[in-house]
C-alpha cells in the first residue's frame, strides 16, 4: 500500500512503478506535511496511525524524478522533470517570482495566490499558507485564497435555476443596480 496525490500516482504509473515521489507544493496540501520543517509531520502520522513508509519521497518541484517506462508509455523513455500543485504552477507560470506578487485564476473556481517569499506568512483573514514550490533546495511560500465554485455558481444560475441565459448576462445584471448594499 502506498499513498500519494494525483501527481504521485501519475509518476508511479508513467515510470512503471519505479518512482514514488511528490514535490513540496503537493506535500503541503495533504494535511500530513509540516510546512515549517519541510517534512512529513510525525505527530499527525502517529495520530492518524499512518506508517511513514507509505508516503512518497518529497523532492524539489523541478528535478528529474525518473523516466517514463517504454513498456507503459508509447515505447518512449522521457524524463519526468517537474510537478507542482496547479495553482502554484500558475503562480510560477505567471512570473510571480518575487515576494508580494499576486495572480488570480478564474475558472470553475477562483484562486488568488500571493508569493510570500522564503518564510511562511500566517493570514489573519482565513487565507491558506502553503508551499508554492521548492527549487534548488530553496522553498518559496504562498498565501492562497479560493472560492471553489465561483464559475460553477454562474453555470448553476444558467443551467440549473435558469435565472440567466448566458454567463455574460451576470455582468449586465450587476451593472443594472445602483449599489450592492454591501453584497459582493
Give residue ranges: language-model regions.
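Active-site core segments that coordinate phosphate-bearing ligands/cofactors
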Residues: 1-20, 31-42, 46-47, 68-184
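Residue-level "edge-of-site" marker
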Residues: 57-58, 171
